A protein has these predicted regions:
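A ligand-binding cleft/hinge motif common to bilobed small-molecule-binding domains
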Residues: 44-56, 67-72, 145-150, 178
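Short, well-ordered beta-strand elements
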Residues: 1, 18-24, 127-132
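Extracytoplasmic "Venus flytrap"
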Residues: 1-3, 27, 137-139
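Extracytoplasmic
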Residues: 17, 37, 45-47, 54, ...
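Pocket-lining segment of extracytoplasmic ligand-binding domains
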Residues: 114, 126-178
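Short helices/loops that flank or line small-molecule/ion binding pockets
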Residues: 23-43, 51-56, 169-178
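A conserved helix-loop-strand patch within extracytoplasmic ligand-binding domains
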Residues: 65-138
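Short, polar/charged alpha-helical segment
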Residues: 1-18, 146
Length: 178
């Protein structure tokens, strides 16, 4: 089990730890609040949550991850069987967030525009129904908001007409598209 694996790994590094208690927070904010209150000793969180609680916590570990075979900023190069993306790239220190078009009629219309090389207008995006995560989610809120601001005259997710907050995970978010 994970506590035993952690104890063994720490012992290899010269740390003889007797007890490890692992809990899973109900969401990023709850974990950040527990860290700020001192009711837990360590937490593993995305950068967006760190930004909210940075006055109360310190970073002690960072991790990299394998990059993807596709690192293009051109959305049409991510689509279709010929552009299948694999997790076989080099270690990277960044995080990529993607905005997906669902199989809804309007989602297909937006995807067709992008795949034809057309830039989506603010009106195109504003007409869509957006599923987003909590405001502390890097990939599910912060990065898409930053992308909108950079590409649509400072507009943000909060400026969109049809936003559906999803706070129960990405799987649930995708199930709404079905």
């Amino acid at each position: 089990n994970l506590p035993e694996l952690l104890k063994a790994a720490l012992l290899e590094q010269g740390y003889d730890v007797k007890d490890i208690n692992i809990t899973v927070g109900t969401n990023y904010e709850a974990t950040g609040e527990a860290m700020a209150a001192g009711t837990v000793d360590l937490g593993w969180l995305p950068g967006g949550t760190y930004a909210l609680f940075s006055d109360d916590v310190d970073v002690i570990l960072t991790a990299t991850r394998a990059g993807l075979s596709n690192d293009s900023e051109d959305p049409k190069t991510w689509n279709g069987d010929a552009n299948k993306t694999l997790k076989n790239g080099p270690q990277v220190t960044f995080y990529r967030s993607l905005i997906y078009a669902t199989p809804s009629a309007y989602g297909k219309e937006l995807a067709a525009k992008v795949n034809a090389g057309e830039k989506l207008t603010w009106e195109d995006l504003d007409k869509a129904t957006w599923a987003v995560q909590k405001t502390s989610s890097s990939a599910g809120y912060i990065y898409p908001s930053m992308w909108l601001m950079a590409n649509y005259d400072g507009k943000k997710i909060s400026d969109l007409s049809n936003v559906m907050p999803i706070d129960s995970g990405y799987g649930t978010a995708f199930s709404y598209a079905a």
